[in-house]
């Protein structure tokens, strides 16, 4: 009999029925037994609506208990869950529908009209999509229905299709199976003792993102944790929740931790309960790491991408102080290398591409074998990320290969410049992009969100002091509004560059 990704929930419903499974927005609590019953009722609802094992079901909506219940209910009957990113445009949503071919899409009220408009366009061949409200699952709470019969599933049957953000091409549907999901959970169960039954985890990012369903729904429920979901991220509320609920585990992007650290109440907040705090999605600025370290909280840099299950390596606790930028050396079963274009291993401190091999790496892309063959070569997934391995084998990520700026024959990593500029106290966000240059081919340009006290001269003066001359931004643009982000929450480097055509005309020249 194949172990299913929902078996963990059912186990804890028997083993610890009264243990809190989920606390939503600080008030709405449900225990494991109640959640198991609710998701069985959801599975029967799906069947009555026409969903069958192997069918795809799209889900779009803000964080909610109904989102969780609808997803687990679909998995219990053997359907494939396809999270639709809340921030995708109408055209992007239409692409997801056409590519994934769902039989059904569930939407909350906030996203229903946009999705309905996307579905109103001429459908793909033989495509008939039913649109249902996520709110329909609210009334199923408390129902006592018969458990959903186990589907006839194999270990390599697909359970989820999670789409990438589409930074350089159309979003790709990353596949997860029962086997790959359990491999990821087991890998980190060996490595991280904080991921233990009854531990208290908080999640403030979108459930529709790459880490949502796998890392912050299925993973904690399989391990018997108690999860505190927030409707969204609000710095003061999240900081208060960390302290009041004695949260032990949290993961987020650098911006979350930076915004909380800037709060006046941060200094007095009791965060002593935190045991495992991971920061991912981008390189964390060292000043942010230090601000939390001053409170005794180790921010541990993680590395991963959708194709790697969200996280494939995590800086060990004993390295978080001495090597704050390290992403670690891999996990128990997952290996990482840094290689040259010819596939040979780089020497220590030599930049190269990070490649990954492990049991949790995606087994493929949905309907895109060519892209998978290009990425997965000789058993190693080629990430497209530039990394550097030190003499002890610890890796630090430098940048995306495609983001590296080649100026006058020299390679420049935008993240290196961004790390320096981020040290200026007036800087809220910074993105370094390439700008065309007649002499050097391309040069670095910095687009900064900062308060009015910051000047381009201050930026370039610091960069001249800290960086080689060819790394100093030749253009500096300062704005008072946040930088544009992708649906995943990462800074949208390409969109920011395209939004500033003046960069080609020396908007803020630097000698």
Language-model features: locations:
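AMP-binding/adenylate-forming catalytic domain of the ANL superfamily
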Residues: 468-490, 508-510
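Conserved AMP-binding/adenylate-forming core of the ANL superfamily
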Residues: 10, 18-64, 68, 72, ...
